[in-house]
Amino acid sequence: MVSAQARCAAGLQIRVTVSILGHWLIGYFAHNQGRRDWDVPGAAVQGHNVRWCALLTMGESWHNNHHAFPGSARIGLEPGQWDPGWWVLQLLHRAGVVSDLKLPDSLPARADLKRLNRYCSDA
């Protein structure tokens, strides 16, 4: 029989491993390949939106959107862009735990930001 402490330790290791792998996944794929709907002139690296890992990464895979609007609490900006991180933030906001959530419309306008594509749900 496995002790509760051993199960807790194993669960912690699994959670940390999945979190680190998700971070590396975004670091590689979302900076190298995927759809780009925005261009940020002068940026050292452009982000890409990687649809297939949106749920695994809590929405962080909408990285091109993040590079376009880094101060936004919501990263899945278009219809069909699942953003579980935003869903959690909304629940926390309703519970009074977080406040002052910023969205692209409430951020200062960026004159250098250029829209490349309009989002298409089958892309």
Place the predicted regions along the sequence by residue.
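Basic, amphipathic juxtamembrane/active-site segments
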Residues: 72-92
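Interfacial helix-loop-helix junctions of multi-pass membrane proteins
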Residues: 33-34, 69-74
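Hydrophobic transmembrane alpha-helical segments that form the core helix bundle
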Residues: 1-58, 87, 91-94, 98-123
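Surface-exposed beta-strand edges and their flanking turn/coil or helix-capping segments
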Residues: 70, 78, 114-116
